[in-house]
C-alpha cells in the first residue's frame, strides 16, 4: 500500500472514530477512485472539487431566500442593523482568511493532514463544528503570518 492510500485509510479511521462523516466519506471515495483505477479523476477533483463544494454550500445557504423563508425585508433589516453590519465585516474577513488558507494549501498540500487532525480534536474535545479545511487553513495562515513577524 502506498503512502497516499495509507494516509486515506488513516483519515477514514479518524473520521469514523471522530464521527466525522465528511472526512470518512471523502477518504472512502478517494480510496475507491484509487483502487478502481479511476485515478484519472484526481486532477479533475483537485482542480474543480473546491468549486463544486462551494457551489453546493452556496446553494444550501440561498435556499431560504429562494423559498421566501427569508424575505427581502429581513435581508434589508439585517444589512442595516449592527448585527448585519458585523456579519458583513465577518464575511469580508472570512473570505480573506479563506483566500490565504487556499494559498497555504497550494504552497504546502501536506498541511491538510494537520488541519484535519486539528478539526477532529476540535470536534471531539471542544464540541466544534467542521465546516471544511479552508477556514482552518486560513486561521493557520494567519498564525504563520503572525509568527513570521517575530522572525
Curated annotation (Swiss-Prot):
Record bears the keyword Metal-binding: no
Keyword annotations from UniProtKB, A to Z: Cell membrane, Membrane, Transmembrane, Transmembrane helix
Residue ranges crossing the lipid bilayer per the database entry: 9-29, 47-67, 75-95, 111-131
Pfam family, one: DUF441
Annotated localization: Cell membrane
Record-linked PANTHER family: UPF0756 MEMBRANE PROTEIN YEAL (PTHR38452:SF1)
Protein name (record): UPF0756 membrane protein Dred_1676
Lineage summary: Bacteria, Bacillati, Bacillota, Clostridia, Eubacteriales
Amino acid at each position: 500500500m502506498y503512502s497516499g492510500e495509507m494516509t486515506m485509510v488513516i483519515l477514514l479511521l479518524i473520521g469514523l472514530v471522530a464521527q466525522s462523516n465528511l472526512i470518512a466519506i471523502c477518504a472512502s471515495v478517494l480510496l475507491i477512485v484509487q483502487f478502481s483505477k479511476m485515478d484519472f479523476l484526481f486532477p479533475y477533483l483537485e482542480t474543480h472539487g473546491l468549486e463544486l463544494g462551494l457551489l453546493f454550500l452556496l446553494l444550501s445557504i440561498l435556499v431560504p431566500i429562494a423559498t421566501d423563508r427569508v424575505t427581502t425585508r429581513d435581508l434589508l433589516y439585517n444589512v442595516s442593523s449592527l448585527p448585519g453590519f458585523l456579519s458583513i465585516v465577518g464575511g469580508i474577513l472570512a473570505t480573506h482568511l479563506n483566500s490565504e488558507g487556499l494559498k497555504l494549501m497550494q504552497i504546502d498540500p501536506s498541511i491538510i493532514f494537520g488541519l484535519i487532525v486539528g478539526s477532529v480534536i476540535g470536534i471531539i474535545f471542544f464540541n466544534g463544528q467542521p465546516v471544511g479545511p479552508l477556514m482552518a487553513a486560513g486561521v493557520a495562515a494567519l498564525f504563520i503570518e503572525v509568527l513570521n513577524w517575530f522572525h
